[in-house]
Every structure is written in C-alpha cells, then in structure tokens.
Amino acid sequence: MTRSFSCVALLILAVVTASSQTLRDSAGRSGMLVGTAVRPQQLSEPLYAATLAREFNMIEPEDVMKWETIHPAPESYDFSQGDRLVAFAISHRMKVRGHTLTWHQQNPPWLNDRQRTPEQQARILEQHIKTVVGHYRGKVFAWDVVNEAFDETTPVKLRSTIWYDQPGIGRAGKGSAYIEDCFRWAHAADPDALLFYNDVEAEAVNPKSDAVYAMVRDFRRRGVPIDGVGFQMHLGNLHPDVASISENIGRFIALGVQVQITEMDVALPVDSSGNARPADLRLQADVYREIASACLTHAGCTAIQTWGFTDKYSWIGSHSKHTQGSALLFDGEYRPKPAYDALRKVLEGSRRQ
C-alpha cells in the first residue's frame, strides 16, 4: 500500500510539474542557458532523468571528464561515461559543458611521479587536452580548460600543483604561462569550442578575482584564445554582496569575454534529518533570485548552472559532515523548493533576445 501510494504520488508530481512552466521554458524565452552538473550513473533513475530533461537546456559532468576517470592510465582513455552523458544531451536537445581539462585534484596516481621532467609532464598534458577535446569536438560546446589555478592566500598567487611547479610543465615562475599553453592546446583541438577559466570564491570583487581579471586582460590583449570566465558560486552566506558580484561580472564582460555561473549551490544549516528551516529556505530563494538577476542584468552573462539539482545527490552533506545541506533547487524527493520558483520567475521576467 505504501509503495503504491509513493509511486502514484511521484507520478502526480511529475505530471503536475511537467504541465507547469519549467526552468528550461523560461530560460529559452530569456535567451539564457540554465544548466546543472550531472552524474551519468543517475540517468538510470527515471525521475532523475525526467527532471533533468524537462528543466535544463545544458548539462555538465560532475566527475566523469576529470583525469582520474577519463585518463586512468598513461595509455588508456575511458570515454564511456562522458559519451553516455553526451548522448543523453543530444537526445534531449541540450548543450554540454566539458569539465575540466586541468585541475589539481582528482588526478590518477600515475600522474604523481615526481621523477618526471617538466618536459615530459608538458607532453602528457598537451596530449591529454588535445585527445579529450578532440574526442568531443562538435559535441561539447564549451570547456573549463583550467580550474582553480589561483590559491586563497594573501597575496593571491598561482596554486602549487603538478601542472605549475611540482614538477610543472616548464612554466614555473612564469606567471600564467602554463594556463596559456592549456588554452592554446584546447583551441587547436577544437577551434569552435568556447574556452573558459573557472574558479571558486572569485564571484565578487576581491583579491582572487583581481588576479583572475589581470590574467584574462593580459590574455585578451595578446590574443590568447580565452572566451569566458566561470564563477562557481558555491555559497554558504545567505547575504552575499550582490552589488560586488554584479560589478565583477560587468568588468569581465567589458574585456570581451562571457561570464557563466557554473557551480551554484547555497548551503543551509540542517537538522539531523537533513531538513532546513522554512525561514532559511526563503532566504535561500532570495539568494538565487538576486544572483540570477545580477547575471541577467549583463548581456554577456550567458548561463546559470547549479552543481546538481536535487538535494538527494548534493555534495554539501558529506563535505560538511551533514551539518549543512538543502543547497539545490529540488529536495531529495524531486519536489521544487522556493529557490526553484525564484529562479524560474527571474528567468521568465527577462527578455534579452
């Protein structure tokens, strides 16, 4: 009886939601991309797949295009899960953002050979970028070429990584030269793909975004093929400085690049059952509304993407030892939250085409 009731309830929820205005409908009318990060293994769950296809016009892999999955051994590439995601996107008329070609985390153990020379490391990175981008040429419209290259120290500096200086690719001490190499290699593999630099805690005007801004300005002046900047927008603050975020978006767009919000979630305090307070859910909705409005104010802010869409699979709980959660647009039962309605209404109210 209980199982039958649950199935009926889910069916009713799907029918009601499908008959209403969706995020995808509203984004299409405003000329925006609205996306989410995806785990391909969850596509086998009918309600996950149905909600994803109905609500979003863009998807991005959470993990399956990162090194540890796609290039697990020196001479071995595994495109199977990435291909599955791309096939889903094509069948549902969705765009795909590739994530990520160069990062300091989630790399396979074989990359951590400290006996390797910078020249050898450079050849490995170049081959990887050209192989992965080439495999998805014409199917992935945009790439996060380099992710989180700047650290959080004061003053901000390039993060010490296997790509920069341990052993690096022969560009240590030469500023953002290794990042430039990555963009040139990606462009050579797919000249039509949009190439983004992506970072965390750089959404407002601050020392990190200043460092990113200086790099992008230099790249644009010298013709380095960079097309955009991604602001991750992982927020734990229910009162972000929206004016500063809007100012930051504007100054990057003035350089001639796009800005995309790439990994948004808004973490809330939760109880032992994972439930947030209604008052916090309303504040969360305000944050989604205000950030989306700040993006939509600028014609060059072209996408709003969340890091997952259902609290059922959010990374926030495990990351915070389950003291935070409820960060996304749908709850664990795929019911839209106040944040969903707030984002949809902002998209519906915009006419930028």
Kindly give the residue locations of the regions a language model identified.
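Hydrophobic h-region of N-terminal signal peptides that target proteins for export
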Residues: L10-S19
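Boundary/entry segment of secreted carbohydrate-active catalytic domains
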Residues: Q21-E62
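Substrate-binding cleft and catalytic face of glycoside hydrolase catalytic domains
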Residues: L23-R24, R54, M58-P72, Q81-A202, ...
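Hydrophobic faces of well-ordered beta-strands that scaffold small-molecule active sites
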Residues: V34-V38, N57-P61, V96-T100, F141-V145, ...
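Acidic-and-aromatic substrate-binding clefts and catalytic sites of carbohydrate-active enzymes
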Residues: A37-Y48, W67-S80, F150-T154, A202-A211, ...
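Glycoside hydrolase catalytic-domain groove-lining segments
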Residues: D83-K95, I169-N198, V205-G274, A292-T297, ...
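Substrate-binding cleft of secreted/luminal carbohydrate-active enzymes
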Residues: L281-H319, D331
